[in-house]
A protein has these predicted regions:
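A short, active-site helix/loop in glycosyltransferases that binds the activated sugar's phosphate group
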Residues: 92-93, 140-172, 248
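Acceptor-binding helix/loop patch of EC 2.4 sugar-transfer enzymes
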Residues: 14, 103-104, 108-137, 197, ...
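Acidic donor-binding loop of glycosyltransferase active sites
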Residues: 79, 272-286, 299
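Conserved catalytic-core segment of nucleotide-activated headgroup transferases in glycan assembly
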Residues: 40, 166-170, 175-268, 272
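Conserved acidic donor-binding segment of nucleotide-sugar-dependent glycosyltransferases
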Residues: 318-326, 334-339
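N-terminal subdomain of nucleotide-sugar transferases
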Residues: 1-50
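C-terminal amphipathic helix plus adjacent low-complexity
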Residues: 348-413
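Short hydrophobic beta-strand element within catalytic cores of glycosyltransferases
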Residues: 290-293, 300-304
Length: 413
């Protein structure tokens, strides 16, 4: 019998705008490759760049927050698996799933650890060393509680698995490592990519409403790019990303060669003709979609430690990893001007992609894991007493707050 997956999205997937959107489409592809029927629901309004899920024959449902209409929808759909797109969605809808579809497997797709990103942001603002006092923040309490309430959480980075196990003491049986899932890079694809002599300029990519990307943009503009431009006056910095605001567009300066290009429909078409990708992230979490795009297109990178986290495992990076602005600029210049270095780093990227992110390495095992837990879901939950406790206590407050808002809204209308 065909199994039914309900994905509740924080937003409608935008694979051309963000790594989160690409990740969601990869999950959808994984489920469909094993013949799961998919319903995608979201309380968010669709944006212009949202992917047309009709093309994949996916049922789409607009849902309301704090509304009993979701309960009726859930009971009628009766899904086998419910995937929550980030912990905020689980907070809103998780208790309703537990109440009306208690046998459904609850899966949290963390995207990245929001609490880790927030802690690093706070430490950066304080100009302090990141430690437990920053990691154990208000977001942590919410996100870790959400992980416990779910049967399985998908973690995109091995580094984050270790943080959850060692810092938060989350049991490993609640966590599943599932990185970006990409096609392999064949010899034919490598051969067709533009060579170094056919490429020019530097590139940076990132959704501008994502706080780490905006901070990286300012760091690049004011502390790194002037050092590069001084040595390479003919080179330009091309910055691409969705949702460029006025404050972003004001950073455009043709005289300095710093160009805000904005949204691009196909990042591959600009990435493969760029010579070097720069990723000067100072805080953040998860895996960086911009580095995946760069490696897929054979574009070497200069990146910070934060950007490189979880990307390379035991393999050589597709570029240089440096945090100091002057050293970052020096390595960018070196990579831009040295063909031997450039070719070597490009090859590293191909090796990393095929060894660490080829979807064929992960999808079958992931589906087996889901099926195994779902088949023995009661036994699995008995090993998660903390989750049962949070389900009983924390969710009661969430549930009754939601019902109070629901009642309040009904009185208004």
């Amino acid at each position: 019998m065909t199994k039914h997956v309900l994905i509740i999205g924080f937003v409608w997937p935008e694979p051309k705008s963000s790594a989160a959107g690409s990740r969601m489409m990869q999950l959808i592809e994984a489920f469909q490759s094993f013949n799961y029927k998919i319903t995608f629901a979201s309380a968010c309004a669709k944006q212009d760049h949202a992917f047309d899920l009709n093309l994949l024959d996916i049922q789409q449902v607009f849902i309301q927050l704090n509304s009993a209409s979701f309960d009726e929808f859930l009971k009628e759909l009766n899904p086998d698996i419910v995937v929550f797109d980030r912990f905020m969605v689980e907070e809103q809808f998780g208790w309703r799933v537990s109440e009306h579809c208690p046998e459904a497997l609850k899966v949290l797709d963390t995207e990245d650890l929001h609490c880790l990103r927030k802690g690093r942001e706070l430490a950066l603002k304080d100009k302090a060393l990141f430690d437990k006092s920053y990691l154990f923040n208000e977001v942590s309490k919410r996100e870790i509680a959400s992980i416990y309430r779910c049967d399985l959480s998908l973690i995109i980075s091995e580094e984050e698995i270790e943080i959850l196990k060692n810092q938060f003491k989350v049991s490993e049986h609640l966590l599943y490592y599932l990185p970006f899932l990409t096609d392999s890079i064949s010899a034919d694809i490598k051969k067709k990519l533009p060579k170094i002599k056919e490429r020019e300029h530097f590139i940076s990519v990132g959704n501008f409403i994502h706080a780490p990307n905006y901070d990286a943009l300012l760091f690049l503009k004011y502390e790194i790019w002037p050092l590069i431009r001084k040595k390479l006056p003919q080179a330009e910095m091309h910055v691409y990303g969705a949702y460029a605001s006025e404050k972003v567009n004001q950073l455009n300066n043709k005289k300095e060669g710093f160009l805000i290009k904005g949204y691009v429909d196909d990042v591959n078409q600009v990435m493969k003709y760029a010579k070097v990708c720069l990723a000067p992230l100072r805080f953040g979490a998860g895996l960086k979609g911009k580095l995946i795009d760069a490696m897929l297109n054979g574009t070497p990178c200069v990146m910070t430690t934060i950007a490189a986290e979880g990307m390379f495992g035991g393999f050589e990076a597709n570029g240089f990893i440096v945090d100091d602005p002057q050293k970052f600029a020096d390595k960018a210049i070196e990579l831009y001007t040295d063909k031997i270095f450039w070719n070597g780093k490009q090859k590293n990227g191909f090796v990393v992609m095929n060894a660490r992110f080829d979807k064929r390495l992960f999808i079958s095992d992931f589906m087996y894991k889901m099926n195994a837990i779902h088949t023995n879901i009661n036994a699995h939950r008995l090993d998660n007493f903390t989750g049962q406790m949070l389900q009983q206590q924390t969710l009661q407050s969430t549930k009754y707050m939601s019902k109070w808002i629901e009642l309040k809204n009904s009185i208004k209308t």
